[in-house]
Amino acid sequence: MMIKQYLQVTKPGIIFGNLISVIGGFLLASKGDIDYPLFLSTLLGVSLVVASGCVFNNYIDRDIDKIMERTKNRVLVKGLIDPKVSLIYASVLGIAGMLLLYVAANALAMMLAVIGFVIYVGVYSLYMKRKSVYGTLIGSLSGAAPPVIGYCAVTGQFDTGALILLLIFSLWQMPHSYAIAIFRFKDYQAANIPVLPVIKGISVTKNHITLYILAFMVATLMLTLSGYAGYKYLVVAAAVSVWWLGMALRGYKATNDSVWARKLFVFSIIAITSLSVMMSVDFNVHSSAVLLTYAG
């Protein structure tokens, strides 16, 4: 039973979701020439760092998790793992993941993992989530780190492709997270978490969702327009973006915001998975514009 609890506290669903985006970034950069030991090491390294961040987040959020319906049965809330032990566990996971990325990939991949981790645990979980309506925006940067780590593990440099991936996944996080905040509105309100729907209202949030999906649409197309992905990717990116935008616009006429937001949330996962798969298989061999280079 203890193994199950130690697994649950790492939030396996979040790890799996992040792995799909890591694979997308890695295979996009590989352009068909896959280094399998590096591929597996990168997946494991990112998994360990994400798991570490999730355990720290569970530790930090114990007080609010017990208030929220969705989180009241979490392992640390129920006292199934000693909080001090969870901190040691999280630290070991994080250090192992970062060292693996440094040794197996390069310094840039490790540095991106450190930055994503610090933003998620230090800036978002410890402060912004509880204090600011902009918490979601800050958190989106850490959520966009995994595909960029996957990409830079291959290239060893932060180029235009890495920047576009950062934009795509950051912009995707916003409607995805706002949809959760709408259908979990009462939970966030009860826990006094200042998400946009609670602070500004659901109608304002719908406007933000629409604008972010429009920006996401432009960012997804940039991957092909800049020569990184092919036209099959472009067709799928355009199709899922337009469909997602249509769903967002239907929200203005929705009679039940919670049901609408849940559908929008589910489709957001389909959308980002589709893009990750397409960039994995429809890549272009392209000479990258280097913005920032680190020797791996």
Swiss-Prot record:
Q: Which InterPro entries match?
A: Protohaem_IX_farnesylTrfase, UbiA_prenyltransferase, UbiA_prenylTrfase_CS, UbiA_sf
Keyword entries, A-Z: Cell inner membrane, Cell membrane, Heme biosynthesis, Membrane, Transferase, Transmembrane, Transmembrane helix
> Its annotated pathway?
Porphyrin-containing compound metabolism; heme O biosynthesis; heme O from protoheme: step 1/1
Q: What is its main location?
A: membrane
Tell where it localizes: Cell inner membrane
Q: Which GO terms describe its cellular component?
A: plasma membrane
Task: Recall the GO molecular function terms of this protein's record.
Answer: protoheme IX farnesyltransferase activity
Determine the domain of life of the protein's source. Answer: Bacteria
Q: tRNA processing: present as a keyword of the record?
A: no
Which Enzyme Commission numbers does its entry carry?
A: 2.5.1.141
* Residues in coiled coil: none
Q: Which PANTHER family match?
A: PROTOHEME IX FARNESYLTRANSFERASE, MITOCHONDRIAL (PTHR43448:SF2)
Q: What else is known?
A: Carbon 2 of the heme B porphyrin ring is defined according to the Fischer nomenclature.
As for family, the record states: Belongs to the UbiA prenyltransferase family. Protoheme IX farnesyltransferase subfamily.
Tell me what this protein is called. Protoheme IX farnesyltransferase
Kindly list the organism's lineage. Bacteria, Pseudomonadati, Pseudomonadota, Gammaproteobacteria, Enterobacterales
**Gene field:** cyoE
